[in-house]
């Protein structure tokens, strides 16, 4: 049923909170492709008889493909709406993750993890843009709740994965979770839409504040923000991929490590609405400065304090993820603040490339550095990169102002974005 004055659906399908819930559910369904990997890494390594670095390279490749799929998928999302791209993304997650447990070679592992990663990139972009477009007045909070789904969504899966890994093995764990994730994503695709969209098609309304991807890539603001996002991701992705292997190197029990993975995901996801809300109140860049500064200090101290015992290890994981996770509420909303919403799906894909590039360190390279030079060296590198992000957010980005498109003059209030 349509509202004759607005042309919008009424009832549940016209309620923007319904679409925020769908966005969060989508994030929950793709969360495990990244955040449960640390549980799979050692069983996969043992099954294939290869090094940890070789297995973690699969994680890196998946992250890279996630970034590559977002601008391309975003083009079709911006042009036609989210439904058909979401169906394709869900099918890729289903096929890639379900069959990963059947691989008998490293190339097959890489191929299937990248297929799942490509699907994740498409789904992530759709979920985040659904939240941003339905909530232009509460963009930080909406982005935070949606990003929280990506961090927290893995939690219900962790006991299932741990149990199935012990009883039935890695193949069954991949298959059960892959089927659940893929099928639910495809079902959500039948009802999701953007505001102003009727049916499957979407019309783009472009204003002078909307930058297409080519225009955005020519602004210095994009590249400084990209560098900050790239820098702060080193430490978080190192821990995402390697918190369990690192904990084992400290001699921690398997039960402690399982609790640690749950805690890191709880704080990683739970912090995102909080930091999004804070950024709506005090500004994106001030919030970035606080988050990135604390993260740099935590990573510098991580190997010293985590070695003190079980509680210290879990506490450091919690603080590290509570700060790093905030970036996933801050950058999507900043992207829409500065470059507009008309092309936001494809534009955020270019921001996501920063995370993918940082994952090279978080996955195979980080594991190789830890193996050859020790974990202290790996954590020191991540502390330095988070400090770079802090410096950019504190001293550089706020002074740059808002980019101006096509010689359009903006008021001082418009130019001073947060």
UniProtKB/Swiss-Prot annotation:
Oxalate binds at residue 355. One of its GO terms (cellular component) is plasma membrane. Pfam families: MFS_1. Changing residue 349 to C: Loss of activity. The keyword Ion transport applies. GO terms for molecular function: antiporter activity; oxalate transmembrane transporter activity. The chain crosses the membrane at residues 17-37, 48-68, 84-104, 108-128, 141-161, 172-192, 222-242, 250-270, 288-308, 311-331, 350-370, 378-398. CDD domains: MFS_MCT_like. One of its GO terms (biological process) is monoatomic ion transport. It is a multi-pass membrane protein. Changing residue 271 to A: Slight decrease in activity. Changing residue 66 to C: Residual activity. InterPro entries: MFS (IPR011701), MFS_dom (IPR020846), MFS_Riboflavin_Transporter (IPR052983), MFS_trans_sf (IPR036259), Oxa/Form_antiport (IPR026355), Oxa_For_antiport_fam_transptr (IPR004741). Keywords: Antiport, Cell inner membrane, Cell membrane, Ion transport, Membrane, Transmembrane, Transmembrane helix, Transport. Changing residue 355 to R: Residual activity. It is found in: Cell inner membrane. NCBIfam families: 2A0111, oxa_formateAnti. Belongs to the major facilitator superfamily. OFA (TC 2.A.1.11) family. Monomer. The protein has a two-fold symmetry axis, with a central cavity which may be associated with substrate transport. Residues contributed from seven transmembrane helices probably line the substrate transport pathway. Anion transporter that carries out the exchange of divalent oxalate with monovalent formate, the product of oxalate decarboxylation, at the plasma membrane, and in doing so catalyzes the vectorial portion of a proton-motive metabolic cycle that drives ATP synthesis. This is Oxalate:formate antiporter.
